[in-house]
């Protein structure tokens, strides 16, 4: 989707072209790759992989230039064939959501801790054998999914994360899940005592849940990966439009307190979120 600005940043277009070239894809234009959201000429959301929103294509590798997508907020690259990720990916310091489940990953970049804005990191259903020590630097992390890998060891630094190790959210999603691994001895204390240490999600149910999350991000009404005054205006317009009922997506994104009504309370919640950030 576009925000009305028909200009595309050449750096971002170059990255998309690099992805097409390195994977030998038969795609004529970079803006036809997967699903994309652009804001002020920059790519803010990118979905690509063997799923509907991803264009039903399979990537095998990523170019080093992926780290140049400096405004990217949301990246869904599940259902691909990645074995490793380029170190340059850790330059994506504005990235909030990173979903790389259902790949073949055996490791993560050592400097993943540089991705300081990450809230959601999903590495489920890969072949990960270890986690980098720097994982503990991700102080904004709320969700960490590492289930169904080949992990036998986790660094103690993981306990630096501000995660509710035992909890589930309002959609019954666990904040943490590490089931389906080989985690037995000498575990970090936060993991050893976690009620979610054996938590995993069945692939069929998992796919449904993530699709819902993919399409509905609370307070982000224009789905650009940023919560700002544009979203406040969108809520006001919904409230003022007395002739039409809000769509399911509008309710999902704008009803911040989940009381099934969109009103001034939701506007205040968005304003407070912007101020806090």
Residue spans for each PLM region:
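N-terminal capping/linker segments that flank leucine-rich repeat
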Residues: 1-61, 172-175, 179-219, 223-224
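Leucine-rich repeat
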Residues: 40-41, 68-71, 90-95, 113-118, ...
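Conserved hydrophobic beta-strand positions in leucine-rich repeat
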Residues: 44-49, 75-77, 95-100, 119-123, ...
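Consensus "Asn ladder" position of solenoid repeat domains
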Residues: 57, 80, 100-103, 126, ...
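Glycine-rich active-site/cofactor-binding loop and its immediate structural neighborhood
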Residues: 59-64, 68, 76, 80
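The feature encodes a structural signal of leucine-rich repeats
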Residues: 62-67, 85-88, 108-111, 131-134, ...
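Tandem-repeat architecture and repeat-register "anchor" residues
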Residues: 65, 88, 111, 134, ...
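Cellulosome-associated attachment modules in secreted, modular CAZymes
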Residues: 213-277
């Amino acid at each position: 989707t576009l925000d009305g600005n028909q200009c595309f940043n050449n750096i971002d277009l170059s990255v998309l072209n690099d992805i097409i070239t390195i994977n030998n894809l038969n795609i004529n234009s970079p803006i036809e790759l997967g699903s994309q959201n652009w804001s002020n000429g920059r790519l803010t959301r990118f979905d690509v992989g063997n799923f509907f929103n991803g264009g039903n294509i399979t990537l095998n590798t990523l170019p080093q230039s992926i780290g140049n997508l400096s405004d990217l907020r949301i990246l869904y690259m599940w259902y691909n064939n990645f074995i490793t990720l380029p170190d340059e990916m850790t330059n994506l310091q504005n990235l909030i959501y990173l979903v790389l489940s259902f790949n073949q990953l055996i490791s993560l970049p050592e400097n993943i801790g540089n991705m300081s804005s990450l809230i959601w990191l999903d590495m489920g259903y890969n072949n990960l054998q270890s986690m980098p020590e720097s994982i503990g630097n991700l102080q904004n992390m709320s969700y960490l999914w590492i289930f169904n890998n080949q992990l036998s060891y986790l660094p103690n630094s993981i306990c630096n994360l501000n995660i509710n190790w035992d909890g589930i959210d309002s959609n019954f999603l666990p904040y943490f899940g590490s089931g389906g691994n080989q985690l037995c001895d000498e575990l970090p204390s936060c993991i050893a005592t976690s009620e979610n240490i054996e938590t995993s999600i069945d692939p069929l149910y998992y796919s449904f849940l993530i699709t819902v999350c993919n399409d509905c991000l609370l307070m982000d009404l224009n789905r650009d990966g940023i919560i700002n005054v544009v979203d406040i205006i969108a809520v006001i317009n919904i409230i003022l439009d007395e002739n039409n009922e809000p769509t399911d997506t509008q309710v999902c994104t704008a009803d911040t307190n989940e009381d099934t009504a969109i009103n001034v309370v939701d506007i205040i919640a968005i304003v407070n979120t912007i101020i806090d950030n």
